[in-house]
Amino acid sequence: MKILKFQIKDFRNLKKIEYQPSPGLNIFYGENAQGKTNILEALYYLATGNSFRSNKEKTLISYESSSLQVQARYNHQERIIDSSITYGLDGKVFRINKKRASYNHTDRLRIILFSPDDLYLVKGAPYKRRFFLDFLLGQISNEYLFKLDNYRKILKKRNLLLKKEETNSRSFAIINDIFMDLAAQLLISRLNLINVLDEAIQEIYPQINNDGGQLKIRYALSFPVDSGKINLDILKDSLKKQVESETEKEKKRKTTLLGPHLDDMHIYLNEQMARLFASQGQQRNIVICLKLAEIMTFRKIKGFFPIFLLDEVLAELDDSRSNKLLKYLAQSPFQSFLTSVKLEKFEVMDASIFLVKDGCLLGKE
Protein backbone atom coordinates (compact mmCIF):
# COMPACT_ATOMS: atom_id res chain seq x y z
CA MET A 1 0.00 0.00 0.00
CA LYS A 2 1.39 3.40 -1.02
CA ILE A 3 -0.16 6.85 -1.15
CA LEU A 4 -0.01 8.34 -4.65
CA LYS A 5 -1.35 11.76 -3.67
CA PHE A 6 -3.25 13.43 -0.87
CA GLN A 7 -5.05 16.70 -0.19
CA ILE A 8 -5.61 18.29 3.21
CA LYS A 9 -8.03 21.20 3.56
CA ASP A 10 -8.81 23.29 6.66
CA PHE A 11 -7.15 20.85 9.05
CA ARG A 12 -5.66 22.80 11.98
CA ASN A 13 -3.26 25.36 10.39
CA LEU A 14 -3.23 23.56 7.03
CA LYS A 15 -5.55 25.63 4.84
CA LYS A 16 -4.90 23.63 1.68
CA ILE A 17 -2.08 21.18 0.95
CA GLU A 18 -1.75 18.96 -2.09
CA TYR A 19 1.16 16.54 -2.31
CA GLN A 20 2.32 13.64 -4.46
CA PRO A 21 4.66 11.75 -2.15
CA SER A 22 7.62 9.59 -2.97
CA PRO A 23 6.89 5.84 -2.78
CA GLY A 24 9.72 5.58 -0.24
CA LEU A 25 10.83 8.04 2.45
CA ASN A 26 9.16 11.46 2.72
CA ILE A 27 10.53 14.02 5.19
CA PHE A 28 8.75 17.15 6.43
CA TYR A 29 11.06 19.45 8.36
CA GLY A 30 10.83 22.91 9.87
CA GLU A 31 10.49 24.80 13.12
CA ASN A 32 7.97 23.86 15.79
CA ALA A 33 4.28 24.84 15.40
CA GLN A 34 4.52 25.17 11.60
CA GLY A 35 2.29 22.19 10.71
CA LYS A 36 4.62 19.19 10.29
CA THR A 37 2.81 16.98 12.77
CA ASN A 38 -0.56 18.22 11.48
CA ILE A 39 0.17 16.53 8.14
CA LEU A 40 0.75 13.18 9.85
CA GLU A 41 -2.27 13.72 12.08
CA ALA A 42 -4.46 14.36 9.03
CA LEU A 43 -3.34 11.10 7.38
CA TYR A 44 -3.91 9.22 10.64
CA TYR A 45 -7.36 10.81 10.92
CA LEU A 46 -8.21 9.65 7.41
CA ALA A 47 -7.08 6.11 8.22
CA THR A 48 -8.70 5.70 11.64
CA GLY A 49 -11.31 8.41 12.07
CA ASN A 50 -9.48 9.59 15.19
CA SER A 51 -6.71 12.01 16.10
CA PHE A 52 -3.63 10.74 17.95
CA ARG A 53 -3.31 14.14 19.67
CA SER A 54 -6.80 15.24 20.75
CA ASN A 55 -10.19 13.82 21.69
CA LYS A 56 -11.90 17.09 20.70
CA GLU A 57 -12.57 16.86 16.98
CA LYS A 58 -13.78 20.45 16.74
CA THR A 59 -10.22 21.61 17.43
CA LEU A 60 -9.07 19.90 14.22
CA ILE A 61 -11.01 22.37 12.04
CA SER A 62 -9.05 25.44 10.93
CA TYR A 63 -9.87 28.78 12.49
CA GLU A 64 -12.70 30.56 10.66
CA SER A 65 -13.64 27.35 8.79
CA SER A 66 -16.73 25.24 9.40
CA SER A 67 -15.41 21.90 8.14
CA LEU A 68 -12.28 19.96 7.26
CA GLN A 69 -11.49 17.46 4.52
CA VAL A 70 -8.70 14.94 3.98
CA GLN A 71 -8.46 12.93 0.75
CA ALA A 72 -5.96 10.36 -0.49
CA ARG A 73 -5.45 8.17 -3.52
CA TYR A 74 -3.39 5.04 -2.93
CA ASN A 75 -2.65 1.71 -4.52
CA HIS A 76 -3.82 -1.33 -2.64
CA GLN A 77 -3.24 -4.86 -3.91
CA GLU A 78 -2.96 -3.75 -7.55
CA ARG A 79 -6.00 -1.45 -7.35
CA ILE A 80 -6.32 2.33 -7.05
CA ILE A 81 -8.42 3.44 -4.08
CA ASP A 82 -9.77 6.92 -3.31
CA SER A 83 -10.74 7.62 0.27
CA SER A 84 -11.87 10.80 2.01
CA ILE A 85 -13.10 12.06 5.33
CA THR A 86 -15.04 15.25 5.99
CA TYR A 87 -16.00 16.63 9.37
CA GLY A 88 -18.10 19.69 10.15
CA LEU A 89 -21.57 20.85 11.08
CA ASP A 90 -23.15 17.79 9.42
CA GLY A 91 -20.95 15.37 11.34
CA LYS A 92 -18.26 13.04 10.06
CA VAL A 93 -18.45 11.22 6.74
CA PHE A 94 -15.96 8.63 5.51
CA ARG A 95 -15.96 7.51 1.88
CA ILE A 96 -14.21 4.85 -0.17
CA ASN A 97 -14.36 5.47 -3.92
CA LYS A 98 -16.98 8.20 -3.32
CA LYS A 99 -19.33 5.83 -1.47
CA ARG A 100 -20.06 6.18 2.23
CA ALA A 101 -18.23 3.49 4.16
CA SER A 102 -17.35 2.38 7.68
CA TYR A 103 -13.88 2.25 9.18
CA ASN A 104 -13.77 -1.53 9.02
CA HIS A 105 -13.82 -1.37 5.21
CA THR A 106 -11.21 -3.74 3.77
CA ASP A 107 -9.88 -1.03 1.43
CA ARG A 108 -9.27 1.57 4.13
CA LEU A 109 -5.85 3.14 4.52
CA ARG A 110 -3.67 1.21 6.97
CA ILE A 111 -1.31 3.18 9.20
CA ILE A 112 1.40 2.44 11.75
CA LEU A 113 2.33 5.48 13.84
CA PHE A 114 5.35 6.45 15.91
CA SER A 115 4.74 9.49 18.10
CA PRO A 116 6.60 10.84 21.17
CA ASP A 117 3.78 9.47 23.35
CA ASP A 118 4.81 5.96 22.32
CA LEU A 119 7.80 6.18 24.67
CA TYR A 120 5.32 5.18 27.36
CA LEU A 121 5.24 1.75 25.69
CA VAL A 122 8.39 0.90 27.62
CA LYS A 123 7.95 2.54 31.02
CA GLY A 124 4.25 3.37 31.01
CA ALA A 125 1.29 1.49 32.46
CA PRO A 126 0.32 -1.95 31.05
CA TYR A 127 -2.73 -0.53 29.24
CA LYS A 128 -0.35 1.27 26.85
CA ARG A 129 1.16 -2.04 25.77
CA ARG A 130 -2.25 -3.71 25.55
CA PHE A 131 -3.37 -0.89 23.25
CA PHE A 132 -0.25 -1.45 21.13
CA LEU A 133 -1.25 -5.10 20.59
CA ASP A 134 -4.96 -4.37 20.14
CA PHE A 135 -4.35 -1.59 17.61
CA LEU A 136 -2.17 -3.83 15.45
CA LEU A 137 -4.61 -6.74 15.70
CA GLY A 138 -7.44 -4.35 14.81
CA GLN A 139 -5.54 -3.21 11.71
CA ILE A 140 -5.09 -6.85 10.75
CA SER A 141 -8.50 -8.28 11.64
CA ASN A 142 -11.99 -6.77 11.84
CA GLU A 143 -13.05 -9.96 13.61
CA TYR A 144 -10.64 -9.22 16.45
CA LEU A 145 -12.12 -5.74 16.89
CA PHE A 146 -15.61 -7.27 17.02
CA LYS A 147 -14.54 -9.76 19.71
CA LEU A 148 -12.72 -7.06 21.69
CA ASP A 149 -15.81 -4.86 21.66
CA ASN A 150 -17.99 -7.77 22.83
CA TYR A 151 -15.49 -8.64 25.55
CA ARG A 152 -15.59 -5.10 26.92
CA LYS A 153 -19.40 -5.18 26.99
CA ILE A 154 -19.47 -8.55 28.76
CA LEU A 155 -16.79 -7.41 31.22
CA LYS A 156 -18.90 -4.39 32.09
CA LYS A 157 -21.97 -6.59 32.71
CA ARG A 158 -19.91 -9.04 34.77
CA ASN A 159 -18.53 -6.26 36.96
CA LEU A 160 -22.03 -4.86 37.43
CA LEU A 161 -23.30 -8.23 38.73
CA LEU A 162 -20.27 -8.47 41.04
CA LYS A 163 -21.09 -5.04 42.46
CA LYS A 164 -24.73 -6.08 42.94
CA GLU A 165 -23.55 -9.33 44.58
CA GLU A 166 -25.57 -11.42 42.11
CA THR A 167 -22.90 -14.05 41.49
CA ASN A 168 -25.27 -16.93 42.19
CA SER A 169 -27.77 -15.86 39.55
CA ARG A 170 -28.32 -17.63 36.24
CA SER A 171 -27.38 -14.40 34.47
CA PHE A 172 -23.94 -14.42 36.08
CA ALA A 173 -23.36 -18.05 35.03
CA ILE A 174 -24.26 -17.26 31.42
CA ILE A 175 -22.10 -14.12 31.38
CA ASN A 176 -19.24 -16.07 32.96
CA ASP A 177 -19.27 -18.61 30.12
CA ILE A 178 -19.30 -15.88 27.47
CA PHE A 179 -16.59 -13.96 29.34
CA MET A 180 -14.25 -16.97 29.45
CA ASP A 181 -14.87 -17.87 25.81
CA LEU A 182 -14.18 -14.34 24.54
CA ALA A 183 -11.19 -13.92 26.86
CA ALA A 184 -9.59 -17.11 25.56
CA GLN A 185 -10.13 -16.07 21.93
CA LEU A 186 -8.55 -12.64 22.51
CA LEU A 187 -5.64 -14.20 24.35
CA ILE A 188 -4.82 -16.74 21.65
CA SER A 189 -4.82 -13.92 19.08
CA ARG A 190 -2.46 -11.84 21.21
CA LEU A 191 -0.16 -14.77 21.94
CA ASN A 192 0.09 -15.69 18.27
CA LEU A 193 0.81 -12.05 17.43
CA ILE A 194 3.54 -11.82 20.07
CA ASN A 195 5.33 -14.80 18.51
CA VAL A 196 5.42 -13.14 15.07
CA LEU A 197 6.35 -9.74 16.54
CA ASP A 198 9.20 -11.23 18.54
CA GLU A 199 10.66 -12.90 15.45
CA ALA A 200 10.52 -9.58 13.59
CA ILE A 201 12.18 -7.73 16.48
CA GLN A 202 15.05 -10.22 16.59
CA GLU A 203 15.70 -9.49 12.91
CA ILE A 204 15.23 -5.71 13.02
CA TYR A 205 17.19 -4.77 16.16
CA PRO A 206 20.69 -5.50 14.76
CA GLN A 207 19.84 -3.61 11.56
CA ILE A 208 19.15 -0.42 13.51
CA ASN A 209 21.80 -0.90 16.21
CA ASN A 210 25.41 -2.01 16.24
CA ASP A 211 25.72 -2.49 19.99
CA GLY A 212 25.48 -6.29 19.84
CA GLY A 213 22.41 -6.21 22.08
CA GLN A 214 19.25 -8.30 22.00
CA LEU A 215 15.65 -7.17 22.24
CA LYS A 216 12.74 -9.52 22.88
CA ILE A 217 9.14 -9.43 24.06
CA ARG A 218 7.00 -11.84 26.07
CA TYR A 219 3.29 -11.93 26.87
CA ALA A 220 2.41 -11.79 30.58
CA LEU A 221 -0.92 -13.39 31.46
CA SER A 222 -2.90 -12.25 34.49
CA PHE A 223 -3.47 -15.88 35.54
CA PRO A 224 -1.40 -19.10 35.57
CA VAL A 225 -1.66 -21.51 32.64
CA ASP A 226 -0.91 -25.23 32.67
CA SER A 227 2.56 -25.92 31.31
CA GLY A 228 3.02 -27.18 27.78
CA LYS A 229 1.92 -25.86 24.42
CA ILE A 230 -0.81 -23.25 24.83
CA ASN A 231 -3.92 -23.51 22.67
CA LEU A 232 -7.49 -22.28 22.89
CA ASP A 233 -8.76 -25.24 24.94
CA ILE A 234 -5.90 -25.01 27.44
CA LEU A 235 -6.54 -21.29 27.87
CA LYS A 236 -10.25 -21.90 28.47
CA ASP A 237 -9.57 -24.63 31.04
CA SER A 238 -6.94 -22.58 32.88
CA LEU A 239 -9.18 -19.53 32.87
CA LYS A 240 -12.12 -21.54 34.20
CA LYS A 241 -10.04 -22.94 37.08
CA GLN A 242 -8.73 -19.51 37.96
CA VAL A 243 -12.16 -17.86 37.78
CA GLU A 244 -13.51 -20.48 40.19
CA SER A 245 -10.62 -19.96 42.61
CA GLU A 246 -10.85 -16.15 42.44
CA THR A 247 -14.62 -15.88 42.87
CA GLU A 248 -14.50 -15.03 46.58
CA LYS A 249 -11.87 -12.33 46.03
CA GLU A 250 -13.91 -10.90 43.18
CA LYS A 251 -17.02 -10.82 45.38
CA LYS A 252 -15.13 -8.83 48.02
CA ARG A 253 -13.54 -6.41 45.55
CA LYS A 254 -16.64 -6.31 43.32
CA THR A 255 -14.63 -6.42 40.11
CA THR A 256 -13.07 -8.91 37.67
CA LEU A 257 -9.52 -9.79 38.72
CA LEU A 258 -8.24 -11.63 35.65
CA GLY A 259 -8.50 -11.56 31.90
CA PRO A 260 -6.92 -9.91 28.85
CA HIS A 261 -7.86 -6.45 30.17
CA LEU A 262 -5.24 -6.97 32.91
CA ASP A 263 -2.43 -8.62 30.93
CA ASP A 264 0.88 -7.05 29.95
CA MET A 265 3.67 -7.29 27.40
CA HIS A 266 7.14 -7.52 28.93
CA ILE A 267 10.05 -6.02 26.99
CA TYR A 268 13.58 -7.27 27.62
CA LEU A 269 16.81 -5.58 26.53
CA ASN A 270 19.83 -7.83 27.01
CA GLU A 271 17.77 -10.11 29.29
CA GLN A 272 16.80 -7.22 31.59
CA MET A 273 13.35 -5.66 31.98
CA ALA A 274 13.51 -2.56 29.81
CA ARG A 275 11.05 -0.58 31.94
CA LEU A 276 13.44 -0.90 34.90
CA PHE A 277 16.84 -0.49 33.26
CA ALA A 278 16.54 1.18 29.83
CA SER A 279 17.81 4.75 29.46
CA GLN A 280 15.75 7.44 27.71
CA GLY A 281 17.69 6.92 24.48
CA GLN A 282 17.34 3.14 24.72
CA GLN A 283 13.59 3.49 25.29
CA ARG A 284 13.19 5.51 22.10
CA ASN A 285 15.30 2.97 20.23
CA ILE A 286 13.20 0.09 21.58
CA VAL A 287 9.95 1.75 20.51
CA ILE A 288 11.33 2.36 17.00
CA CYS A 289 12.17 -1.35 16.73
CA LEU A 290 8.71 -2.28 18.02
CA LYS A 291 7.08 -0.07 15.39
CA LEU A 292 9.20 -1.52 12.59
CA ALA A 293 8.31 -4.98 13.86
CA GLU A 294 4.63 -3.95 13.66
CA ILE A 295 5.08 -3.17 9.98
CA MET A 296 6.85 -6.44 9.20
CA THR A 297 4.28 -8.43 11.19
CA PHE A 298 1.43 -6.72 9.35
CA ARG A 299 3.10 -7.56 6.03
CA LYS A 300 3.62 -11.21 7.01
CA ILE A 301 -0.02 -11.69 8.02
CA LYS A 302 -1.86 -9.47 5.51
CA GLY A 303 0.44 -9.69 2.51
CA PHE A 304 0.98 -5.95 2.04
CA PHE A 305 2.75 -3.11 3.84
CA PRO A 306 0.93 -0.37 5.77
CA ILE A 307 2.00 3.30 5.67
CA PHE A 308 4.52 4.34 8.36
CA LEU A 309 4.17 7.74 10.08
CA LEU A 310 7.05 8.92 12.30
CA ASP A 311 6.63 12.11 14.32
CA GLU A 312 9.89 13.58 15.68
CA VAL A 313 11.48 10.14 15.79
CA LEU A 314 15.01 11.57 15.47
CA ALA A 315 14.81 13.60 18.68
CA GLU A 316 17.17 12.25 21.35
CA LEU A 317 18.76 9.75 18.94
CA ASP A 318 22.49 10.20 18.40
CA ASP A 319 23.77 10.96 14.89
CA SER A 320 24.84 7.38 14.24
CA ARG A 321 21.44 5.86 15.10
CA SER A 322 19.59 8.64 13.28
CA ASN A 323 21.52 8.08 10.07
CA LYS A 324 21.13 4.32 10.38
CA LEU A 325 17.35 4.67 10.79
CA LEU A 326 17.05 7.09 7.85
CA LYS A 327 19.07 4.76 5.65
CA TYR A 328 16.88 1.82 6.72
CA LEU A 329 13.69 3.74 5.90
CA ALA A 330 15.02 5.00 2.56
CA GLN A 331 15.86 1.45 1.48
CA SER A 332 12.68 -0.17 2.82
CA PRO A 333 9.89 -1.45 0.53
CA PHE A 334 7.21 0.42 2.50
CA GLN A 335 6.28 4.11 2.32
CA SER A 336 7.09 6.36 5.26
CA PHE A 337 6.42 9.97 6.30
CA LEU A 338 8.76 11.51 8.87
CA THR A 339 8.86 14.88 10.64
CA SER A 340 11.97 16.56 12.05
CA VAL A 341 12.98 20.02 13.26
CA LYS A 342 16.38 19.97 11.54
CA LEU A 343 18.13 17.81 8.97
CA GLU A 344 21.51 19.48 8.49
CA LYS A 345 23.51 16.92 10.44
CA PHE A 346 21.88 13.85 8.91
CA GLU A 347 23.02 11.96 5.85
CA VAL A 348 19.61 11.80 4.16
CA MET A 349 19.57 9.79 0.95
CA ASP A 350 16.85 8.74 -1.48
CA ALA A 351 14.18 10.83 0.23
CA SER A 352 11.62 13.44 -0.78
CA ILE A 353 12.28 16.43 1.50
CA PHE A 354 9.98 19.41 2.10
CA LEU A 355 10.11 22.41 4.39
CA VAL A 356 6.86 23.10 6.28
CA LYS A 357 6.32 26.76 7.14
CA ASP A 358 3.10 28.48 8.26
CA GLY A 359 1.04 25.47 7.21
CA CYS A 360 2.49 25.36 3.70
CA LEU A 361 4.73 22.84 1.94
CA LEU A 362 7.82 24.43 0.40
CA GLY A 363 10.79 23.00 -1.43
CA LYS A 364 13.89 22.05 0.53
CA GLU A 365 15.84 25.11 1.72
Curated annotation (Swiss-Prot):
Secretion signal, residue range per the UniProt entry: none
UniProt entry keywords in alphabetical sequence: ATP-binding, Cytoplasm, DNA damage, DNA repair, DNA replication, DNA-binding, Nucleotide-binding, SOS response
Matches recorded under PROSITE patterns: RECF_1 (PS00617), RECF_2 (PS00618)
Annotated SUPFAM superfamilies: P-loop containing nucleoside triphosphate hydrolases
Pfam family membership, one: SMC_N
Record-level GO cellular component terms: cytoplasm
Residues reported to bind ATP: G30, E31, N32, A33, Q34, G35, K36, T37
Localization annotation: Cytoplasm
Keyword DNA damage recorded: yes
GO biological process, one term: DNA synthesis involved in DNA repair
InterPro entries the UniProt entry points to: DNA-binding_RecF, DNA-binding_RecF_CS, P-loop_NTPase, RecF/RecN/SMC_N, RecF_2
GO molecular function terms listed in the Swiss-Prot or TrEMBL record: ATP binding; single-stranded DNA binding
HAMAP family for this protein: RecF
The family this protein is said to belong to: Belongs to the RecF family.
Function: The RecF protein is involved in DNA metabolism; it is required for DNA replication and normal SOS inducibility. RecF binds preferentially to single-stranded, linear DNA. It also seems to bind ATP.
Name this protein carries in UniProt: DNA replication and repair protein RecF
Source organism (scientific name): Syntrophomonas wolfei subsp. wolfei (strain DSM 2245B / Goettingen)
Gene transcribed to yield this protein: recF
